[in-house]
Amino acid sequence: MMIRAEELNAAPDSQKLDLLYDLLKNDKTNLVVMKQFLQLIINSGLKRTDPRLAFLFTKLDEHAHMKAASEQSLHDDSTIDGLLLSKEDFIDCIHESCEIVFQALEGEFIIPEFQPFVAKIKNIFDDCKLVTSGKVADYIPQLARMNPNYWGVSVCTVDGQRFSIGDTKIPFCLQSSSKPLNYALAQNDLTAEEVHAHVGQEPSGRSFNELSLDYNKKPHNPMINAGAIATVSLLKTSWKMADRFDYVSNEYKRMAGGEFVGFSNSTFLSERDTADRNFALGYYMQENKVFPDNAKLQETLDLYFQLCSVEVNCESGSVIAATLASGGICPTTGEQVLSSEAVRNTLSLMHSCGMYDYSGQFAFKVGLPAKSGVSGIILLVVPNVMGICIWSPPLDELGNSVKGIRFCEDLVKVFSFHNYDCLRNTNKKYDPRRREVQHQSNQVVALLFSAANGDVSAIRRFYLQGMDVSQSDYDGRTALHLAAAEGHVEVAKFLLEKCRVNPTPKDRWNFTPLDDAVSSSTLFKLYFFFIFFFLLKIKFKRNNVVDFLKQFGTPSTPVRKEKIPSSPTEKIPWSPTPLMESKIKKFAPTTPVPVAAPESE
């Protein structure tokens, strides 16, 4: 069920609440069944734990407690679903959350039809689950002990729609996926110019931990180890070490909307004990004066190892990715955590440098900003749409999750999420941002109006775009029907010769385009056209039908200049053809009977 947006939008809040109650109430009891109401909310993609619904569920919990007390029974959280609320109680529960509730019921989220989208994500997840290659990172024992069968994916849209499947509540360390977050925080505190006085922006073309700097004696970019260490040195440099860590971890938690963000001390200790290369990078950069003047190398490296050891799970990671997708605004809290400029620059570098030595191929195949880590995490960002956290510990030879890479590549094969899928006339993928029914209806209306008005150029354009020009409206009327009825020979010629549509489709009254041609004022033009079409195409194998018809004196028909309705509500004059009248004259033409009768016959 989806509430009509125009009905709710046209009313002030109080009237909206009244209208919503009238739409949801049981007509016999005048009570709202909360189980049905909550199911509508959940189907839109919202979780019961969404902070924006906290007031709603607090009030429902109060009503459930009162109901349990009145019935002298033990309270059970599930009794929320069993509530039947009067108008006053219903409005009392939802008035503080009405904005998000209306958005959910009106289908105004970025993914308006969330369940079909979820079904496709499940299919991709199941396909990737069959992948068994890869090896779990083993340079520290905490990573080596991870179960290689762990596999989880969580999605969070910029409107806070959520979906999780697999092992999405198991904690794991951010590792290198903390690098873009630290870079964004550095730009939040400083300007881009100040940050890039210490670190570059170019892909290095070398290994992520190579002992090298660019021609300016700076790390190439913030997504490799040297650049990430330099970035960490810029985070609250004058603060004490403990305060710096608290600051960054709290910012991570704000990005995650208050969801799980932890810390693995054992991972931190192991990282520090096996960090010879990172210490070498640190001293090399210190020699080349990469760090700010007041930075302390040991503290900088310790903070870097600590931030790599911060834990998330797939669900909280997806909210962090969605915060990046929405320009720094956490989708579940509405809080502006990062500046839009910081996010823009972060996504740019994630796109070009985020996947270790696979970054170029990933940008080519997937075309989306992403950052991976050796724990098996991939933070994937679809700008202005959603963030996805993908986790599977087995890695390929470049340090990226094998299942994660496969999932990302399959994702853009199914959905039009690749950065360049928006190019005109190239995209036939599923776009979950678009209402499929609305898109199909718009296509049919445009196609049929063009055919009825003799607009061959529009029909040609639709055909080149890959549209099915043989599709029909609810009554089974095709573009060929309308071209025949209106006498547009050129449109009929193009549909039959170039598009090779079925010449004899039947509408709900069993009329073919030939029936419409016979009953129209262009009887001889179209009648002979259809007759000779079969003779020339099938029997005599002649190709140029119209030229052949002109030998018999069949002139072409000029395009009729008919008024196109300016709005969907404008009435269009219509009258049945003589053949239609002969079949439906026994019914009143102003009632639904002429439409329903052929179905019953």
Residue ranges and their predicted role:
Residues 104-123, 133, 186-309, 315-318:
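Active-site-adjacent helix/loop patches that line small-molecule binding or acyl-intermediate pockets
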Residues 460-468, 493-502, 548-555:
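Ankyrin repeat domain, specifically the short helix-to-loop turn at the C-terminus of the second helix
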Residues 159-160, 173-193, 320, 388:
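Active-site SXXK
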Residues 13-31, 50-84:
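Primarily EF-hand calcium-binding motifs
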